[in-house]
Amino acid sequence: MIKLAILLLFTVAIVRCQGPFGPGCEEAGCPEGSACNIITDRCTCSGVRCRMHCPHGFQRSRYGCEFCKCRLEPMKATCDISECPEGMMCSRLTNKCDCKIDINCRKTCPNGLKRDKLGCEYCECRPKRKLIPRLS
């Protein structure tokens, strides 16, 4: 019975996909309006289901996902790739420089991937964390 309950909780946690935005969404989940891409393990925006006609398009959440509310002004032009540091790309989703995703990395890392000085993940596993005992 306990094994069945654990399996059920594990399955629901993966399917629900609700929680903080960012890499590792299979474990952490995704914010409302987005879904977990199991190939890249990153949250992606769900399509907007809205019958409103908005001349300037829909507003976006802080994560860059559109929701059913009209923009009052036209959207700013996207950033230019030349504005982004090396190793980053211009995201049409957020209009900001964002980390490139290495879709060829097939490593399964229990402690996650290492990050470079810009905070972008690269295809190398983080070492196991050393636990330091607390002094009471």
Swiss-Prot record:
Residues 1-17 form the signal peptide. GO terms for cellular component: extracellular region. GO terms for biological process: negative regulation of coagulation. It is found in: Secreted. Keywords: Disulfide bond, Heparin-binding, Protease inhibitor, Pyrrolidone carboxylic acid, Repeat, Secreted, Serine protease inhibitor, Signal. InterPro entries: Antistasin-like, Hirudin/antistatin, Prot_inh_I15_antistasin_leech. Heparin binds at residues 114-117, 128-135. Disulfide bonds join 25-36, 30-43, 45-65, 50-68, 54-70, 79-90, 84-97, 99-120, 105-123, 109-125. This is Antistasin. It comes from Haementeria officinalis (Mexican leech).
